[in-house]
Amino acid sequence: MIPEIEKLLNDQVKYEANASIHYLAMASWADANGYNGVAEFFYAQSEEERLHMTKLVKFINERSGNAIIPQIDQPEPNYKSLNELFEIFLKSEIFVTEQINHIIYQCLEHKDYNVHNFMQWYVSEQLEEESVARTLLDKLNIIGDDKSGQYLFDRDINTMIPEENTPQ
């Protein structure tokens, strides 16, 4: 495996792991604050990011690389609102997309077409993830501080997402 690409993939392992643990913290906050639907959404998102990380680890090792299991940054334990959760969610997904795009660019620069091909799955995933994050944040922005709207958002969150975008 090309060393520069291996480093980028290991960096991506860390980004996926950090997203997973941060989404777990968000799920815990939502659970503790009575937002059971939002909690289930973020528990599922956390698991999905963990699976993305595992897929990368396996790929690196299968390609005779050395996958590095990262130290995880401490997530924020307290959030101010549902809007803050979903603003962070969107920013996180945009960041991950940018990193994946950088990996793709470097794969083309180094003519590493095998990794480029592998990363196309992540490109598709990120299109979906950003779309979901934007849609949910847009809905929360429409709702504003209306408690009834927040209640309905929490109740219906897992039915608002098209089936192909539902976290596995």
Q: Predicted segment positions?
A:
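Iron-associated oxidoreductase/ferritin-like identity signal
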Residues: 1-168
